[in-house]
Amino acid sequence: MATKEKLQCLKDFHKDILKPSPGKSPGTRPEDEADGKPPQREKWSSKIDFVLSVAGGFVGLGNVWRFPYLCYKNGGGAFLIPYFIFLFGSGLPVFFLEVIIGQYTSEGGITCWEKICPLFSGIGYASIVIVSLLNVYYIVILAWATYYLFHSFQKDLPWAHCNHSWNTPQCMEDTLRRNESHWVSLSTANFTSPVIEFWERNVLSLSSGIDNPGSLKWDLALCLLLVWLVCFFCIWKGVRSTGKVVYFTATFPFAMLLVLLVRGLTLPGAGEGIKFYLYPDISRLGDPQVWIDAGTQIFFSYAICLGAMTSLGSYNKYKYNSYRDCMLLGCLNSGTSFVSGFAIFSILGFMAQEQGVDIADVAESGPGLAFIAYPKAVTMMPLPTFWSILFFIMLLLLGLDSQFVEVEGQITSLVDLYPSFLRKGYRREIFIAILCSISYLLGLTMVTEGGMYVFQLFDYYAASGVCLLWVAFFECFVIAWIYGGDNLYDGIEDMIGYRPGPWMKYSWAVITPALCVGCFVFSLVKYVPLTYNKVYRYPDWAIGLGWGLALSSMLCIPLVIVILLCRTEGPLRVRIKYLITPREPNRWAVEREGATPFHSRVTLMNGALMKPSHVIVETMM
């Protein structure tokens, strides 16, 4: 088919099936207009709404507490080499791919794949399982941050001293630790920090293991409820509310991060901390774990393979130049991660100098940085209350907009599955309330005395890098080798007016799948069972449960393939050919070949069948 004819075919296809009718919101279906139903899908009121929503969605806690630690751990500046390879080879291509197919189809994370390639619609279901599990445990971090924030409004921070009911006789304040004449006569093995005791004995009330859940922590349960209520009211009116909330939640954290950066750089010992953060160790590049960490960090920080970016893109206008903004947002995301390292390690360098220890002894990642290392650091600064409040507000806002953007993506994907039912009246709002309530109840298991063990189990398995790599591989495979990268480029040209450089197309076809397969295999080879604090070993049943969480998403893709092939009658070759067609071919021609047409929820065009340009599909045509 000539290029001009193929492009015209794409334009006609989008005008008839995907493009919104005049005066209607994107995604409004003809049958709903005939019935006099209200518009089914909103659109962003301005471009900045989309930009800030995406920025809020993927600039989150991982940028502040995970990237700097991984950079220090994996060779300092040398870590940037694998990081940028994965960034340009997989992160940006998959990020743009998810946004653009959402914009092109005006559908959420599940139904967009039903339009593009019904046989692989399990990609959308896998994404929704991952993001549903992620939404249950990610918000628990915000509950902890809320708890710390409430306790920060005191003249003396409660984790700075040992005179509280939760402290043990072994508790020793850091002021005594810094008194060398007193400290040399004591054994460090017998004493603990008040910061650690506040975290483990007051916040968590940590039990002996996951098989000993203990009682519910009502203070944390109330904090969790508060955060879920805030999340609900941020998204309950759809993009009309989300697009306005992000004006504050996505911008204010950058201002606070800048303040913390300036403060950190002015502290004594900051230079040593930054040197420790960036000093390159090229020899570390020979360790496969360094490359695994780089790959998984890219997928985590760009919030890809969760369906959220596709859902956000589905609210764009058809002619919106999302390619340009996706590249700018990528620079913002990775730049934030890099700058956060200066803010964090300058303060860790100050801590190390104040305590007279090596920086490696105070460097932490994840909750250890947010709830142990940094709270300890602020107790050593002038005006500790002010810096504590500032830090935990920043954490809350960074995490909150990521949370409600991911929940919005989850809601959009599910509502698009059943639009005729869930978009009537206030059913969408009721559905959001039900979904948030279920997630809250599941999250209560993580605010018990054994909740930290459950939290780590979800974090290690449910939304692991292995799951994300699995989904990313199939996304790129379907677009590049079944739908056709050139065909999608034709659609992109129709939307934004020009074709992106070949880098994206080649990444979808070769580079991203190769990186995903390599990282996936090495992740399985280097796998070690989960432990807590490198001491507590999870029982076998808990490890099995963790793998069950991981497989619950990964198995969606092959299961949907099997189910659809079984539901479609006819020779296997004809069934596969029909199910990989991005629109409904002529019904009579298909039935003549002995296949029963696949009945998707999506209404597809009869007749015109655009022939994909790749060999794998052409051999079946």
UniProtKB/Swiss-Prot annotation:
Taurine transport activity is down-regulated upon Ser-322 phosphorylation. Widely expressed. Highly expressed in the ciliary body of the eye. Residues 1-49, 566-621 are cytoplasmic. Its main location: membrane. It is found in: Cell membrane. Belongs to the sodium:neurotransmitter symporter (SNF) (TC 2.A.22) family. SLC6A6 subfamily. Residues 1-42 are annotated as: Disordered. It catalyses: 4-aminobutanoate(out) + chloride(out) + 2 Na(+)(out) = 4-aminobutanoate(in) + chloride(in) + 2 Na(+)(in); taurine(out) + chloride(out) + 2 Na(+)(out) = taurine(in) + chloride(in) + 2 Na(+)(in); beta-alanine(out) + chloride(out) + 2 Na(+)(out) = beta-alanine(in) + chloride(in) + 2 Na(+)(in); hypotaurine(out) + chloride(out) + 2 Na(+)(out) = hypotaurine(in) + chloride(in) + 2 Na(+)(in). This is Sodium- and chloride-dependent taurine transporter. One of its GO terms (molecular function) is amino acid:sodium symporter activity. The chain crosses the membrane at residues 50-70, 77-97, 123-143, 216-236, 245-265, 290-310, 332-352, 380-400, 430-450, 465-485, 508-528, 545-565. Residues 1-18, 29-42 have a biased composition (Basic and acidic residues). The modification Phosphoserine is found at residue 322. It is a multi-pass membrane protein. Coiled coil: none annotated. Residues 144-215 are extracellular. GO terms for biological process: amino acid import across plasma membrane; modulation of chemical synaptic transmission; neurotransmitter transport; positive regulation of cell differentiation; taurine transmembrane transport. Optimum pH is 7.5-8.0 (for taurine transport). Keywords: Cell membrane, Glycoprotein, Membrane, Neurotransmitter transport, Phosphoprotein, Symport, Transmembrane, Transmembrane helix, Transport.
